[in-house]
Amino acid sequence: MTQKIVLYDTTLRDGTQAEDVNLSTPDKIKIALRLDEFGIDYIEGGWPGSNPVDVAFFKEIANYHLKYARIAAFGSTHHPDNKVEEDPNLNALIASGATAGTIFGKSCERHAKEALRLDPKRNLDIIRNSVAYLKRSMPEVYFDAEHFFDGYKRNAEYSLAVLRAAHEAGALIINLCDTNGGTLPNELQQIVSDLRVALPEVRLGIHTHNDCEMAVANTIVAVQAGAEMVQGTINGVGERCGNANLCSIIPVLQVKCGLACLPEPACLLYTSPSPRDYAAS
C-alpha cells in the first residue's frame, strides 16, 4: 500500500508573515476553499485571538462543509506566569472550533534559558501541560518543535526530552522545525533518521524555512528519513526568504517518490496562483 503523506498548509498563517502580504477574512476563506478542493489535509487558518481577521476566519469557515481538509488553529504553549487552564492563548484555540490545535514551544535548551529565561525543566513542564490541556478539549493536537535542529546540534539530549514530553502529553505528530532555515539536507536527513531509531513511537513531521534555499530539499529528505507530515505554503510564501513550497514538494513526493499526497494531483495547475493573487490585491 502506498504511504500517505499528511499535507499541512500554513499559507493563511505563516504565509501572511511575508512582506506586503495582507489577507482579509474573505481572502482567507476563498483560499481555504481552494485548498480544500486541492485535497490538502490540514489548513492552518491563523492564530485565534491574535487579530480580528483570524477571529472572523474561524467563525466564518465553520459555515462551510469541507470535502478533504480539516481546520487547524495555531498558538503557543502557555505563558510561564499563567496557569494552563487560565491561559488566554490556549483557551482561544479551544474556542475557535478548529478540529486541530497546533502549538509551538522551545526545543532548544539555549532558547529556553535565554529567550524565555526559564529553567529547562520548567520549559518541559510547560510543553507537557499545554499539550495535555488542549488534548482534553480538542480532537487533535500537534506540536511544533521550534528551532529543533539548531537545538539538537547543541544539546541532543534536551531536544529529545522536549519531543518525549510533547508525545507523552498526547501530541499526535511532532513537527521538527528548521526555524532559521540554516540546516543542510545531509545533516537534516541524518538527524531525522537518528530520531526514528531513538524515538520509534513518535510520529514526526517537518517544517522548514528557505533562508539557504534548502526548504524543499530538506522537506524531501525528511520524508525519505521517516517524516509523515509536511508543513508548507503555496508558492513558498512566508517570512524572510519564505517557507517550504508545497507546489514544488507535492509533485516530487507524488511523482518522483511514489508517495500518496493528493486525491487529484492535476489540481496543482490551478491552485498555485491563488494565494499570490490575493496577497497582491
Task: Please provide the spans of the model-predicted regions.
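N-terminal capping/small domains of soluble enzymes
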Residues: 2-79, 83
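Active-site mouth loops of central-metabolism enzymes
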Residues: 12-26, 75-83, 114-119, 147-156, ...
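Conserved, mostly hydrophobic/aromatic
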Residues: 15, 35, 101, 143, ...
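Glycine-rich, proline-tolerant flexible connector loops at the mouths of alpha/beta enzymes
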Residues: 41-65, 74-77, 106-117, 147-150, ...
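Alpha-helix-loop-beta-strand connector modules within alpha/beta enzyme cores
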Residues: 55-76, 125-137, 191-204
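Catalytic cores of alpha/beta
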Residues: 214-225
